From Swiss-Prot:
It comes from the Bacteria. It is an enzyme of class 2 (transferase). The gene is thyA. The active site is at 146 (nucleophile). Its EC number is 2.1.1.45. Pathway: Pyrimidine metabolism; dTTP biosynthesis. It is found in: Cytoplasm. GO terms for cellular component: cytosol. GO terms for biological process: dTMP biosynthetic process; dTTP biosynthetic process; methylation. This is Thymidylate synthase. It comes from Shewanella denitrificans (strain OS217 / ATCC BAA-1090 / DSM 15013). Belongs to the thymidylate synthase family. Bacterial-type ThyA subfamily.
């Protein structure tokens, strides 16, 4: 994950000092891109230990269209707790937009089912896009979507995915986002009988929080290890039928975890 460390170095060297919604303060750059060949290993950061269980369960939760943290709590995942109300609800965040985007007619669009069908039947389409940025419902969401839109691309029998992330917490959030969308790309490729291509990450306001600087410097002092491999142990009937035990990460040798505060 040398690309990730290079991004951190770029922000430290060239980032602008900015204020932000949380009042924490950031050092930020605008418009940055990284590319990961998914045939060269699973892009999970090795310069600190990442909590893979949270990444997988969050993705499965999104795919079910769920927007209440109860499922996450059942699996000891607390990454959304700071934004949930007293009943565990988050409003129409990612899962709702992915699976039931409301239309003017009163119906809803299941973008995930739609995209799978389009990849299978129209692989050269330039409309293989899923969006979570529903302007009409932003005020109902506990947190506006950071990873706002992703697009699939099929060429030479390989599936690639590009994510546009309008706002990115590089130290805490980005390792999760890269791994989550890389895994989603693997799942979609399996469902569509395609080989793996690239995962491309594109960031808008790409920042390090001011209270993550020491942690960032510690991480930059560590030598990255070889990437692990992710195995999917079975092919479920649909994209919605994967379970946590279907995924096996092998040869993950990370440096120790680095604790840092979340900006809320």
């Amino acid at each position: 994950m040398k690309q990730y460390l290079a991004l951190m170095e770029h922000i430290l060297a060239h980032g602008a000092v900015k204020t932000d919604r949380t009042g924490t303060g950031t050092r930020s750059v605008f418009g940055y891109q990284m590319r990961f060949d998914l045939n060269q290993g699973f892009p999970l950061v090795t310069t600190k230990k990442c909590h893979l269980r949270s990444i997988i369960h969050e993705l499965l939760w999104f795919l079910q269209g769920d927007t209440n943290v109860a499922y996450l709590h059942e699996h000891n995942v607390s990454i959304w707790d700071e934004w949930a109300d007293d009943k565990g609800n988050l409003g129409p965040v990612y899962g709702a937009q992915w699976r039931s985007w409301p239309t003017q007619s009163g119906k809803a669009v299941d973008q995930i089912s739609q995209i799978i069908e389009q990849i299978k039947t129209q692989p050269d389409s330039r409309r293989l896009i899923v969006s979570a940025w529903n302007v009409g419902e932003l005020d109902k969401m506990a947190l506006a979507p950071c990873h706002a839109l992703f697009q699939f691309y099929v060429a030479d029998g390989k599936l690639s995915c590009q994510l546009y992330q309008r706002s990115c917490d590089v130290f805490l959030g980005l390792p999760f986002n890269i791994a989550s969308y890389a895994l989603l790309t693997m799942m979609v490729a399996q469902q569509c009988d395609l080989a793996l291509g690239d995962f491309v990450w594109t960031g808008g306001d790409t920042h390090l929080y001011s209270n993550h600087m020491e942690q960032t410097k510690l991480q930059l002092s560590r030598e990255p290890h070889a990437l692990p491999q992710m195995n999917i142990l079975r092919k479920p009937e649909s994209i919605f039928d994967y379970q946590f035990d279907d995924f096996e990460l092998v040869n993950y040798q990370p440096h120790p975890h680095i604790k840092a505060p979340v900006a809320i």
